[in-house]
């Protein structure tokens, strides 16, 4: 998920998406522990998406200006 897509979401949608990603991260952690995880890159992707969502939530809460990527 790109940062501009995350910024377009409402605060409620951000919270829902964060909850969904945390559940998926939890399931992937168990798959890794039991040796059933096939796509190991997905855990890194989810971790970064969670960080993006948390960053956007903080920006919206504090009213920080949005900077576009160069």
Swiss-Prot record:
Pfam families reported for this sequence: Ribosomal_L29 (PF00831)
Transmembrane segments: none
Keyword Membrane among record annotations: no
Gene3D superfamilies, per database record: 1.10.287.310
Superkingdom, taxonomy of origin: Bacteria
Keywords: Ribonucleoprotein, Ribosomal protein
This protein's GO CC annotations: cytosolic large ribosomal subunit
GO biological process, one term: translation
A GO molecular-function annotation: structural constituent of ribosome
HAMAP family the record matches: Ribosomal_uL29 (MF_00374)
Entry's family note: Belongs to the universal ribosomal protein uL29 family.
Name of this protein: Large ribosomal subunit protein uL29
């Amino acid at each position: 998920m790109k940062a501009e897509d995350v910024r377009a979401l409402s605060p409620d949608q951000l919270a829902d998406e964060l909850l969904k990603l945390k559940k998926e991260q939890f399931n992937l952690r168990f798959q890794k522990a039991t040796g059933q995880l096939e796509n190991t890159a997905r855990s890194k992707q989810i971790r970064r998406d969670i960080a993006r969502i948390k960053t956007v939530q903080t920006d919206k809460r504090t009213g920080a200006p949005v900077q576009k990527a160069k």
